[in-house]
Amino acid sequence: MSFQVSPGVRVKEVDLTNVVPAVSSSIGAFAGAFSWGPMGIPTQVTSENDLAEKFGTPNTTNNTSYFTAAAFLQYGNDLRVIRASTGALNAVASGSAVKIANSSSYTQSFEAGQGSVGPWAAKYPGTLGNSLRVEVCSSSGFASWAYATQFDAAPGTSSTATKLGVTGALDELHIVVLDEDGAWTGTANTILETFAFVSMAADAKNDNGTSNFYKDVVNAGSEYVWWMDHDTGLTDAGISLSAQATSKVFDGDGGTAIASSLSGGTDDDAY
């Protein structure tokens, strides 16, 4: 038998295709207080960035909840988070704030426009909603609108109106959702969302058959606001194109975009 009398190097080949990477498969659940997000229902969260996006960044009263959830996400990638249902309220465009805990709460109590809080409400309870502003612009106000450059062209007549022979309906709107005070982005009046060429008509459709009624489009696509009622300046909003004369022209914003700043949202992290 031979021996090495001085230090040496032993070479060994390893087939890396046989190595199984470590992948976390743990599923966790956590309920706590957060600044934003749906209340009372489980939401899947896969990372700390995802947690912040869906439930907001921590403040001085909910930081324990936030960092407890974040600690799990350092080692796992499937956490079901439930925002505890507290007395927090949603910011609204006018009147007294209301509580819209989640999408089911909205559908059951507010979808038909029975909120009496103006045209818009924050998607979820919390003071973050107080930084939201919604602007709605029809064709008559587009040329002077501060956010006109965010869209390819002025709103006009929808394809549904054209197909029904209401060729001058001017039923379309452009909508922007803004971070008015900078609470979301750190910069005041940052654009958070845009909705282009949506219609005031309840029966307006896209070419693929989906609704192009502005209420439906915003409710389905916005991460920040719910539709609550038609603004008083949009007197024709919600009517059906199929019931109109071919000469019908929708009453838009009167030459100036309609702006709604939300307020009244409150936090409540006690649960």
Model-derived regions: residue spans:
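Surface-exposed assembly/interface segments
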Residues: M1-Y271
